[in-house]
């Protein structure tokens, strides 16, 4: 059983049909395979192929997806992936003309980050206190996942009374 990585994704594309295609694929739970399918020749080697080409072993477990009503060339989605964010897939989406902005947080292995069109701003949170995390990561990343708030709560619940 994997640790789950929380992901927040914003996609934009000049062709609104590509945004609709992404929306529909996310809604079906087939986003990765829609844009970067596992080749038939790799079906027996799916695990290696998926981790190499998507950055994770399974499709996204989507919890929300919507197209911006005011700007139909923009889509926002939230989903979980096994172990890590699908950064390799994001790189592929860029080659298809998408602008990709993503945030991710994996609480089990204590890392988080923000990815924007090829730049990964990665933060190793292992061994840091909630206060250190709050002062280390960008506010928008912390707010997206409630990282420091959850850590403060955990610290409070696990601090022995003196």
Where are these regions (language model features)?
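Long, contiguous binding/interaction regions
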Residues: 1-162
């Amino acid at each position: 059983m994997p640790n789950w990585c929380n992901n927040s994704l914003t996609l934009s594309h000049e062709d609104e049909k590509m945004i609709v295609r992404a929306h529909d694929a996310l809604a079906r739970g087939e986003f990765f395979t829609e844009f970067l399918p596992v080749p038939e020749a790799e079906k027996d080697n799916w695990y290696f192929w998926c981790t190499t080409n998507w950055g994770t072993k399974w499709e996204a477990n989507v919890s929300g997806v919507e197209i911006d009503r005011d700007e139909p060339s923009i889509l926002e989605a939230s989903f979980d992936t096994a172990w890590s964010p699908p950064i390799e897939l994001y790189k592929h989406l860029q080659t298809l003309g998408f602008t990709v902005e993503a945030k991710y947080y994996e609480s089990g292995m204590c890392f988080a980050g923000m990815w924007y069109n090829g730049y990964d701003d990665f933060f190793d949170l292992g061994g840091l206190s909630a206060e250190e995390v709050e002062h280390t990561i960008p506010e928008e990343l912390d707010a997206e996942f409630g990282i420091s708030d959850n850590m403060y709560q955990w610290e409070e619940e696990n601090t022995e009374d003196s």
